[in-house]
């Protein structure tokens, strides 16, 4: 009877949502029913070192910090996976069948994707955990060989110097985690505009009492819309969890008016970042000076990587600069060593204006 009652409640949720739109939102409903929804994977959900939980229909794959990706000895029952799918579909108020074979749901802590068995033999489920806290401190980064302390100091000082920063890398490399850490160095009275389609940065929770506004984008209000609107909302720092499309043109336009940014993007090489950003424009009509604007308004590019054991590190550090109508990309750190390239003078001037004489020494 209890299971029937629970199933009935789940079935009613879409209708209740329409009748009572001011009640708990869908994310809260999923979060509050987490223990029941994820009963067979509760141990993995509650383990802070686990970043991803994936069921391919045959094996349960776990990705864990310091260990990597491995097959768990646990096997999920078909009935359990079916029930999770039905309950999530009911909560979201969507169909999940051969015609609509992709089911996605998000909370503040979890990003869930399930594929229907009509398209992949058995149901496939992927859960990415989004921590609401910082995974590391300055000390943790140094002790874990994430990068030399001088590089960590450089990154922190770059925020103080108001450099616009792009963190690149492949999926699972820890791009957003680095942005979250660097966001703690933004002064409390400088307004951060955090624009996301799925909550990942958690700026307000990580930085309580700092000046900020968090805005969720969708098909109705896009990244382009909110970046443009931010110009009239006194935004000092634009934080994008990921740059992936034509919104980069509006981002650069905002930077040209005096804002600063932190964002992530998929990237293999620091030197490729300007071309990568240009390719994001798609068929958008922009003038041929776009690449020049990238070099002028993006200051620092960081490439992070992750090995098979989920050990993360900084692979490259590069500065972009445009002086005397010439574009420069100076990679000063690569594969664990400093190169013989020097930081551009116009970048050094930005540090000096904030009272930072040695960019590699910790301030305060």
Stretches with model-predicted labels:
Residues 167-169:
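Hydrophobic anchor at the beta1->P-loop junction of P-loop NTPases
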Residues 16-35, 39-40, 309-364:
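NTP-binding/hydrolysis catalytic cores, primarily Walker-type P-loop NTPases
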Residues 1-96, 107:
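N-terminal accessory targeting/assembly segments
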Residues 178, 182:
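Hydrophobic positions on the alpha1 helix immediately C-terminal to the Walker A/P-loop
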Residues 165, 183-293:
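Switch/coupling sub-region of P-loop NTPases
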Residues 47, 59-161:
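P-loop NTP-binding catalytic core
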Residues 172:
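Walker A (P-loop) phosphate-binding loop of P-loop NTPases
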Residues 175:
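Conserved lysine of the Walker
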């Amino acid at each position: 009877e209890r299971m029937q009652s629970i199933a009935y409640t789940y079935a009613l949720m879409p209708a209740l949502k329409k009748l009572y739109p001011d009640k708990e939102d869908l994310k809260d409903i999923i979060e509050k029913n987490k223990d029941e929804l994820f009963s067979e994977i509760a141990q993995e959900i509650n383990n802070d070192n686990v970043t991803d939980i994936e069921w391919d229909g045959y094996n349960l794959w776990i990705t864990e910090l310091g260990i990597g990706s491995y097959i768990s000895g646990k096997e999920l029952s078909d009935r359990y996976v079916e029930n999770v799918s039905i309950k999530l579909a009911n909560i979201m108020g969507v169909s999940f069948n051969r015609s609509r074979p992709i089911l996605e749901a998000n909370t503040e802590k979890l990003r869930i994707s399930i594929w229907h068995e009509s398209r992949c033999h058995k149901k496939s489920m992927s859960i990415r955990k989004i921590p609401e806290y910082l995974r590391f401190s300055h000390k943790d980064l140094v002790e874990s060989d994430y990068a030399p302390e001088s590089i960590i100091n450089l990154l922190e000082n770059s925020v103080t110097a108001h450099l616009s920063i792009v963190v690149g890398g492949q999926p699972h490399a820890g791009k957003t985690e680095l942005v979250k850490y660097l966001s703690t160095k933004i002064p409390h009275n400088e307004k951060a505009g955090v624009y996301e389609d799925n909550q990942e940065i958690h700026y307000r929770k990580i930085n309580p009492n700092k000046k900020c506004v968090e805005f969720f984008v969708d098909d109705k209000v896009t990244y382009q819309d909110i970046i443009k609107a931010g110009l009239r909302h006194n935004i000092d720092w634009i934080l994008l969890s990921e740059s992936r499309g034509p919104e980069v043109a509006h981002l650069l336009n905002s930077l040209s008016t005096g804002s600063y940014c932190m964002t992530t993007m998929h990237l293999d090489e620091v030197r490729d970042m300007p071309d990568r950003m240009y390719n994001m424009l798609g068929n958008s009509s922009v003038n041929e000076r776009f690449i020049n604007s990238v070099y002028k308004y993006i200051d620092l590019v960081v490439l992070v990587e992750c090995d098979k054991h989920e050990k993360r590190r900084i692979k490259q550090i590069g500065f972009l600069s445009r002086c005397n109508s010439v574009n420069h990309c100076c990679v000063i750190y690569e594969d664990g060593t400093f190169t013989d390239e020097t930081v551009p003078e116009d970048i050094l001037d930005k540090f000096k204006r904030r009272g930072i004489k040695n960019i590699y020494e910790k301030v305060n």
